[in-house]
């Protein structure tokens, strides 16, 4: 089965927040994405609410429950106590933990699974006890996969930012793709499932899907939102689904 597509709504939320107005509607755009065939919605609610607001979370949860019960809600963020409280309140199907500093513009690195084990392991245990599937943001580093598994997580999410940044250098892109592929191979061998996200496009997704055919999910926001300005949200979701292999 091809990788499922989760549409990250942060870029939509950031555009809305440029004005003190309710549009574009984060929930409304999420509805368009799901109606066009996306398998889920992702948000990263940061402490300063500079894009996704805490008030968006119950609306997205209700959208999925009431209109698209087959879809999944993925909430990602740094596992502070405030973040964990949000997760436990709004009950996403998946929680993706990222090692972000609150001031970061965007996620730009994965966990050090050995050094961060003491932090992650009890948090993963708490989330799993709550019934959540847990994914951990990961650099392309095959050596870290056993330690990732030992936290108790279900999945890793491969950070594909470097791969996406080589959009005009095919040799570097191919080299980074192989690093991602070897990390996925090690994750599968350790018993983990594999997601991927960051700077993925219809141009670079097919090669990623070919190298990692058992990829479970891709979470895409910036590139998908940029394409939606040209092709509309429904048309863009279709393009990304085809790039995944659907």
From Swiss-Prot:
Pathway: Cofactor biosynthesis; pyridoxine 5'-phosphate biosynthesis; pyridoxine 5'-phosphate from D-erythrose 4-phosphate: step 5/5. Keywords: Cytoplasm, Pyridoxine biosynthesis, Transferase. Its EC number is 2.6.99.2. Its main location: cytoplasm. GO terms for molecular function: pyridoxine 5'-phosphate synthase activity. It is found in: Cytoplasm. The record marks 157 as: Transition state stabilizer. GO terms for cellular component: cytosol. The keyword ATP-binding does not apply. Pfam families: PdxJ. GO terms for biological process: pyridoxine biosynthetic process. 1-deoxy-D-xylulose 5-phosphate binds at residues 46, 51, 106. The keyword Zinc-finger does not apply. It catalyses: 3-amino-2-oxopropyl phosphate + 1-deoxy-D-xylulose 5-phosphate = pyridoxine 5'-phosphate + phosphate + 2 H2O + H(+). CDD domains: PNPsynthase (cd00003). The active site is at 44 (proton acceptor), 76 (proton acceptor), 198 (proton donor). 3-amino-2-oxopropyl phosphate binds at residues 8, 19, 199, 221-222. It is an enzyme of class 2 (transferase). Homooctamer; tetramer of dimers. PANTHER family: PYRIDOXINE 5'-PHOSPHATE SYNTHASE. HAMAP family: PdxJ. Belongs to the PNP synthase family. Catalyzes the complicated ring closure reaction between the two acyclic compounds 1-deoxy-D-xylulose-5-phosphate (DXP) and 3-amino-2-oxopropyl phosphate (1-amino-acetone-3-phosphate or AAP) to form pyridoxine 5'-phosphate (PNP) and inorganic phosphate. This is Pyridoxine 5'-phosphate synthase. It comes from Mesorhizobium japonicum (strain LMG 29417 / CECT 9101 / MAFF 303099) (Mesorhizobium loti (strain MAFF 303099)).
């Amino acid at each position: 089965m091809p990788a499922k597509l989760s549409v990250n709504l942060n870029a939509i939320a950031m555009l809305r927040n440029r004005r003190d107005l309710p549009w574009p509607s984060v929930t409304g755009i999420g509805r368009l994405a799901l109606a066009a065939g996306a398998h889920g919605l992702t948000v990263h609610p940061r402490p300063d609410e500079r894009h996704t607001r805490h008030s968006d979370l119950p609306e997205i949860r209700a959208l999925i429950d009431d209109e698209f019960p087959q879809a999944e809600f993925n909430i990602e963020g740094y596992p502070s106590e405030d973040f964990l409280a949000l997760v436990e309140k709004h009950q996403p199907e998946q929680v993706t933990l990222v090692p972000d500093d609150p001031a970061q513009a965007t996620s730009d690195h994965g966990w050090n699974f050995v050094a961060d084990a003491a932090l992650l392991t009890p948090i993963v245990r708490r989330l799993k006890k709550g019934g959540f599937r847990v994914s951990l943001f990961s650099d392309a580093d095959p050596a870290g996969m056993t330690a990732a598994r030992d936290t108790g997580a279900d999945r890793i999410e491969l950070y594909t930012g470097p791969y996406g940044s080589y959009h005009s250098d095919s040799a570097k892109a191919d080299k980074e793709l192989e690093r991602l592929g070897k990390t996925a191979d090690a994750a599968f061998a350790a018993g983990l499932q594999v997601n991927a996200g960051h700077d993925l496009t219809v141009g670079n997704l097919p090669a990623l899907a070919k190298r990692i055919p058992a990829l479970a999910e891709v979470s895409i926001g910036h590139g998908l939102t940029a394409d939606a300005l040209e092709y509309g949200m429904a048309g863009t979701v279709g393009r990304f689904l085809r790039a995944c292999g659907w």
